[in-house]
């Protein structure tokens, strides 16, 4: 949920050692992108003046161009001040063998779980679900399929179907829309 994400970010951003972990999670959730792509994101992918992300996704090579919202922009400006001298947006905060490198998937997973525990989040939550959560929230908000696809990079509406959950919010929205159209008893 959005509250869980906020709780995670508050904890991660509150400590220097986990700030990059927080930024990776923030970007993945905000832009509904894969953690792996955010973990390897480079400054060249960001147009800070235009407040845009330009990304070629690793899985299917889809290209997306997404806006940078204010909260995320502020964190990126701060991160650029501290880490703009090297290529990665959210590297490990301490050099490894003299270089600032991106987190390995295994190290990211362990560090993310440590932040989740420190934030008091339930053990069943998984960082890998951030893309799904954000996409499901767009579906529930009534965002048109084409717009969702422009964010997620999907080229086929069938690929978005797994994100379309049978939830109370979506059922309520559908029945309310039907009623306002005058097609119920």
Feature names for model-found ranges:
Residues 1-35, 39, 59-62, 131:
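Basic, Lys/Arg- and aromatic-enriched nucleic-acid-binding interface segment
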Residues 5, 69-122:
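Active-site/catalytic core of tyrosine-dependent DNA strand-transfer enzymes
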Residues 8, 112, 160-163:
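Mobile genetic element proteins and their domesticated derivatives, centered on retroelements
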Residues 14-19, 99-107, 124-129:
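N-terminal core-binding DNA-recognition domain of tyrosine site-specific recombinases/integrases
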Residues 26, 30, 36-37, 114, ...:
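C-terminal catalytic core of tyrosine-transesterase DNA break-rejoin enzymes
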Residues 40-46, 128, 149-156, 164-166:
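A short, basic/aromatic helix-end/turn motif that makes direct DNA contacts
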Residues 52, 63-67:
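Well-ordered beta-strand positions in beta-sheet-rich domains
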Residues 57-61, 145, 152-177:
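Catalytic-site neighborhood detector that most strongly recognizes the C-terminal catalytic loop/helix
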């Amino acid at each position: 949920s959005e509250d869980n994400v906020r709780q995670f970010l508050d904890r991660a951003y509150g400590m220097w050692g986990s700030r990059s972990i927080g930024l990776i999670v923030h970007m993945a959730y905000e832009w509904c992108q894969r953690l792996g792509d955010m973990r390897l994101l480079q400054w060249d992918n960001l147009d800070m003046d235009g407040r845009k992300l330009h990304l070629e996704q690793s899985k299917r090579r889809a290209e997306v161009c997404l806006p940078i919202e204010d909260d995320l922009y502020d964190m990126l400006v701060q991160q650029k001040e501290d880490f703009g001298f090297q290529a990665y947006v959210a590297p490990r905060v301490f050099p490894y063998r003299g270089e600032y490198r991106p987190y390995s998937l295994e190290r990211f997973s362990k560090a993310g779980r440590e932040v989740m525990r420190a934030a008091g989040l339930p053990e069943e939550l998984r960082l890998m679900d951030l893309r799904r959560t954000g996409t499901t929230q767009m579906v529930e908000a009534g965002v048109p399929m084409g717009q969702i696809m422009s964010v997620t990079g999907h080229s086929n509406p069938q690929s978005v179907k797994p994100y379309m959950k049978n939830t109370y919010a979506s059922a309520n929205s559908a029945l309310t829309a039907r009623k306002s159209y005058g097609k119920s008893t």
